Amino acid sequence: MTRLLLALLLVWSAQPALALDIKDPALAPVEETSKILGGVQAAPGAWPWIAALLYANDSNVFSAQFCSGVLIDKSWVLTAAHCVQGMSAQGIQVAVGAWDLTKFTGSRTPVRSIRIHPQFSSTSLYNDIALVELSVPSSIQPITLFSGESVDNTPPSLLGKLVTVLGWGVADSTTSWYYPEILRQVSLPVVADSTCNDIYINPVLPSQFCAGYWEGKDACEGDSGGPAVVQVDGHWVHAGIVSAGVSCQEYFGWYGKYTRTSAYLSFIRQYAPYVAVTGKIPAGGTLPAVNLLLLTP
């Protein structure tokens, strides 16, 4: 119940700042706190670098979780700037490798510092990226970042490819606000920027991408700050950060905006210079199609 009430407050407080990003006021309000709808439970241990961001003053991991992130270096977690804006390092703990929030027995690692992108805009959610420094290095293997480059230096296109999004967000908003204890995943196609620009006032920048379904797919993003990952050479790499979406309704699936990881490698390397980066793919600039779990209507 604590988490339910907290979630409703977060959704309500997020709406005014972003409501103007929707071209048609009759459309559902934009919200920063995103959801996984129509996805499936993730297998235990499948995504070891996933991280749950927790309120430090709440001893219950399930109710304390407010955003997600990923371990990209032994001491650094990548997340969305809007997740940690206005928060102190002392107010956050991180559960790396969490799966079932009600049965998490690992360490709740205190945070040493928070690094928000200096050009982050809380209204447009441009540059929605931040780094959280752990006070104790993690023993878990970090995820590799997608470089967004090909062997011939032609930027590869994510358009039409499936990204897998992870989180503990709302699993059902049609009849009730149901937050799952267990990590969930969903596969979403990356769509053309113009498709999202038909909905949002603030256009999709090159430092972002748009993904999701339309009409009847119950498709939303994962928890804010969580990862959108793709496969490169058989390995999962981090391609985007869950940033902004619109409220999910019973018969509508909405496209969400993601911060494009490859656009911020310089920012990331300021603090995590040895982060692993990959993504050199064959000439032609395309990623292989991946047979992933699809949403059900």
Feature names for model-found ranges:
Residues 4-13:
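Sec-dependent N-terminal signal peptides
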Residues 15-19:
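Sec/Tat signal peptide C-region and signal peptidase I cleavage site
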Residues 20, 51, 65-85, 92-93, ...:
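C-terminal subregion of chymotrypsin/trypsin-like serine protease catalytic domains
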Residues 24, 29, 53-56, 77-80, ...:
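Conserved H-D interstitial segment of serine endopeptidase catalytic domains
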Residues 24-28, 102-104, 109, 129-215, ...:
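Chymotrypsin/trypsin-fold serine protease catalytic domain
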Residues 29-58:
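N-terminal activation segment of mature serine protease catalytic domains
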Residues 47-61, 137-145, 189-224, 237-247, ...:
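Active-site region of chymotrypsin-like
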Residues 58, 83-85, 100-101, 121-123, ...:
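Solvent-exposed loop/turn segments at secondary-structure junctions
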